[in-house]
Amino acid sequence: MLDKEKVLTAADPELLFRDGNRHLETGEVHQAEACFRQALRLAPDFASACANLGYLLDQRGEQGEAEACYRRALALDPLQAQTHLNLGALLTCQKRFPAAEAAYSQALLIDPHFTAAWSNLGVLYAYMKREDQAEQCYRQALELDPDYAKARFNLSYLLLRQGRFDEGWACFEARDWHAPLAARMTCPRWQGEDLAGKSILILYEGGHGDMIQFGRYVPALKARGAASITLLCHPALKVLFTTLDGADEVIPFDQAFPAEKGDYWIPLLSLPHLNGTRLDSIPAAIPYLHPDAERVARWSPLLPREGMRVGLIWKGSPLHENDADRSLPTLDLLSSLGTVPGVSYVSLQKGTGEDEAKRPPPAPPLVDLGSKMEDFADAAAIMAGLDLVISVDSAMAHLAGALGKPCWLLLPDFKTDWRWLKERTDSPWYPGTLRLFRQKTRGDWATVIAEVRAALEGLAQQ
């Protein structure tokens, strides 16, 4: 840009606004912010610049100023449907649900065909457990735009949580988690064709827990006659997954994998759909993962010698969208478990929270093994020597279930994961293995832990 053009732009709010949008689209957020703020200095009532500055700040996590920008923009121009939507999304993240509902409703009053607003309102209603209304919103969005993948994906979670698997798995195919890997594949995606004598590459998806839960489908592919099955997985799962029946080769995703070879590829989480899984036909042959005997022998001497041995996991991955609700805020919430006679505790906490295992009481006395684990094969070997695992919703709970190790799962009331269904105290994914302890109200872990303590006391007395 010539110097003269720069001067003209710097004095023109509309040109600054356009430059800000261009910078925002290319990820140059600092330049975008400077453009929007300069535009507003020149034209304080520039509603669109105020709204876009709010969006930029919102994406950066500065929600206080972002909300102020949104509300200022709407005061200047109340007919900005997109800004009502953005404000609703911000309020939803802050759990200010009535205000969020009002914002989305206003967006739809302005534009009844606003598919994103219908979908977001559906998400909000699902959070509020108004599931009939949530479903109506998702279906309205899809009626307006049958190709709107976000609404279809959101609908899948609602249907799966309700056990309506036929349509739920079909809608779940709207996800795009595997898209970057899929773009590298040269062979066709498997759509249920005959696998006799064929090779297939299974792509990893989601987190460690997703991989462990849905790894159960690998033997089903072998039963269909697949000659060779290669499983791509997270590095920390590689050794553990070598014990998975049907997996001929296990490759961590940080290593090269044969994208150009094989007859078919498939994302792991598409296997329930292609296998026609229903609530009464979940592959549930437990265990389907196994501890390594040498590792068991190595970890066994480190376990408590006396009493019932119980493993504890009180935090999941901090990267999970619902971590603030599904993880315990502190290990100290489990302090009452330390007074149950005849029980010894082992920390299986790895990463976030593992430092708490070294704290003195009021936390229950722990043998800290989590900080020493290298991968999930180590965790499996430790669990082999335990009598029970008590865990928040985490990959470790899935590991216990897949190993056939009794596990008590502590679940939040807010955004309870779809896979634990509604109101059940058991799981058809891990029959006879998992017992679910659910919050009755959002954030109330004290009641859940009191129930766990009473159950643990009864078990220890046996």
Where is each model-derived feature located?
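Alpha-helical solenoid repeat scaffolds of the TPR/TPR-like class and their adjacent stem/linker regions
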Residues: 1-388, 393-462
